[in-house]
């Protein structure tokens, strides 16, 4: 359906097990769908950054798209990242054709202006975590370990 509306290559980054099943069941794709075997993390990020939109079932796609600034759609039926939905970073559609196409149309209208989740932009997370950890050591020692 996507290939009927958009005239550009569709890259399907597939796990080797998925490629094996595609071959096993004789699944054929339209001409502009290209199966790509897994690539390095940096190459995959480069692919996402230079694509029109990434469709993924990854649990971290909301964070990745917000932090790196690329358009993405979460193909899961549910998700653990409501903060991304609240600001419109990464809609989740499941495998619903209409929802996917609607989201792609919205990205087409919006262009490269992708909203950010402010929680993901904190720069001092390591310091905060260390302070929290250090603060809890006396409490845990006293009430958990009875030291």
For every predicted segment, state its role.
Residues 1-8, 12-13, 18-147:
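Nucleotide-activated sugar donor-binding and catalytic core shared by glycosyltransferases
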């Amino acid at each position: 359906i996507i290939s009927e509306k958009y005239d550009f290559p569709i890259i399907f980054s597939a796990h080797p097990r998925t490629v094996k099943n595609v071959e096993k069941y004789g699944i054929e794709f339209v001409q502009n769908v290209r199966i790509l075997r897994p690539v390095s993390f940096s190459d995959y990020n480069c692919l996402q950054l230079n694509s029109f939109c990434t469709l993924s079932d990854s649990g971290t796609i909301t964070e990745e798209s917000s932090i790196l600034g690329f358009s993405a759609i979460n193909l899961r039926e549910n998700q653990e990242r409501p903060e991304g939905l609240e600001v419109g970073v990464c809609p989740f559609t499941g495998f619903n054709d209409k929802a996917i196409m609607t989201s792609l149309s919205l990205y087409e209208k919006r262009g490269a202006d992708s909203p950010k989740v402010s929680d993901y932009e904190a720069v001092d997370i390591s310091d905060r975590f260390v302070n929290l950890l250090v603060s809890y050591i006396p409490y845990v020692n006293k009430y958990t370990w009875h030291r």
